[in-house]
Amino acid sequence: MQNEIRQDKIIGSRRFSNYFWAFFLLVGGLGFLLAGISSYFKVNLLPFTNTTELVFIPQGLVMMFYGALSLGISIYTLLTIILDIGSGYNEYNRIENLVKVVRKGFPGKNREILLTYSLSNVRAIGIKITEGLNPTRSIYLCLKDERNIPLTPVQEPTAISNLEEEATDLAKFLDLRLENL
């Protein structure tokens, strides 16, 4: 029974890089916002520098704008971390002849995203590797109606050998062919 069902966990937004950027943007945003407020009230709110000498218009105003923008992005990133957006699992069930792709979305009607496909509708397991400025290395579920469903999460590119090994194992498990996209 255990050999007939395979479940791969997907890490969502709770990755080190998201924690790093949320913290970095929060601290930077607070610094910029406090610098702008300091220039307006002529009171030094930052202990490590004197920002009271900044002219409020335009420097202080721009600093406040960038600070507020940075704080907004950091709060959004923190919310995606708290809600664990994008996490879930892929389940491959040879007993029921199904592939289930389950992910967490944003709160609301579609908080839990469930995609179910019959193995009879699956044509192959596909690998897509693109190099360059924004490299991607992904495994796809290729359906007979020409749709490609991504199975790997958005992340830093993994080693090509690891990706190929994972795709090969999955193709062998599902008794499907492997193709390059």
Swiss-Prot record:
Keywords of this entry: Chloroplast, Membrane, Photosynthesis, Plastid, Thylakoid, Transmembrane, Transmembrane helix
Chloroplast keyword on record: yes
Intracellular or extracellular location(s): Plastid, Chloroplast thylakoid membrane
Residues that span the membrane, as ranges: 19-39, 62-82
Any one of the GO CC terms: photosystem I
GO terms of biological process kind: photosynthesis
Topology term for the membrane: Multi-pass membrane protein
InterPro entries found in the cross-reference section: PSI_Ycf4_assembly
Function text: Seems to be required for the assembly of the photosystem I complex.
Family statement: Belongs to the Ycf4 family.
Protein name: Photosystem I assembly protein Ycf4
Gene: ycf4
